[in-house]
Swiss-Prot record:
Located on the platform of the 30S subunit, it bridges several disparate RNA helices of the 16S rRNA. Forms part of the Shine-Dalgarno cleft in the 70S ribosome. This is Small ribosomal subunit protein uS11. One of its GO terms (biological process) is translation. SUPFAM superfamilies: Translational machinery components. Keywords: Ribonucleoprotein, Ribosomal protein, RNA-binding, rRNA-binding. It comes from the Bacteria. Part of the 30S ribosomal subunit. Interacts with proteins S7 and S18. Binds to IF-3. Pfam families: Ribosomal_S11. InterPro entries: Ribosomal_uS11, Ribosomal_uS11_bac-type, Ribosomal_uS11_CS, Ribosomal_uS11_sf. One of its GO terms (cellular component) is ribosome. Belongs to the universal ribosomal protein uS11 family. One of its GO terms (molecular function) is rRNA binding.
């Protein structure tokens, strides 16, 4: 019986890019918070969201969940050498300010904060009013 000879495959370790300047995109909706850290061209370095960290249901929309997201994303991006960021905030959620503060507390220097929330020129009809 013939023996099966396996070829040895050499796997190279993925190169870590040393990126010093980047962008932080914080999307804070009524239901969740997503923090994405990118280089200046928009290529993702690291990201995190509330559901990924174990928050479920209505706890995903809290400022504390957004803070934990920002810390986790900053930690993964700082391994690539990220030091200075420009922050772009999108959405009406509760975790906007908490995420920015968490990025600063994690050791990233914030050089710019910009609100890029899309504002309709009377586009889609908004959801009906809640009656509680």
């Amino acid at each position: 019986m013939a023996k099966v000879v396996r070829k040895k495959t050499v796997r190279r370790k993925k190169d870590r890019k040393n990126i010093e300047r980047g962008q932080a995109h914080i999307q804070s909706t009524f239901n969740n918070s997503i923090v994405t850290l990118t280089d200046m061209q928009g290529n993702t370095i690291g990201w995190s969201c509330a559901g990924q960290l174990g928050f479920k249901g209505s706890r995903k929309s809290t400022p504390f969940a957004a803070q934990m997201c920002a810390e986790a994303a900053a930690k993964s991006a700082m391994e690539h050498g990220l030091k200075t960021i420009e922050v772009f905030v999108k959405g009406p959620g509760a975790g906007r300010e908490a995420a920015i503060r968490a990025l600063q507390a994690a050791g990233l220097e914030v050089s710019l904060i910009k609100d890029v929330t899309p504002i309709p020129h009377n586009g889609c009809r908004p959801p009906k009013r809640r009656r509680v």
